[in-house]
Amino acid sequence: MIVAINEVSETEMRDDSVFDDGSIPTTWEVAGIEDVKGLKLFLKQAQQWVMSNNKEQLAAAVQYPINNIKNKEEMIAAYDQYFTKEVKLSFAMINFNQIFRTYKGVMLADGLVWIQPVGDTYKIFAINP
């Protein structure tokens, strides 16, 4: 059963202005992220969709076109091609206090997945399986 995610823990929201390795990440503002909690809620929800293979919800969370995929229906048909084991692990292993970000948006697992704000939500704009 899929449950709507509407909470982010205190630990997940702790200050991440310096990563554990001592590096200083780009600011959320540079990445275009005005609502860090909203982004983290999106990521938690996306984790759940990935782990339950909810193709419909994941396809709705993609900004099209992406790679050779023009729309939601094509993404659902090509789901296994893009949401590979490695891509799924990139969602499962998110460290909410170490989210890499640049002017392009936020990156998971060394660039396997990229996410950016679109209107009042967030969208996956690149998947590199």
Predicted segments with their positions:
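C-terminal-biased regions
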Residues: 1-48, 59-129
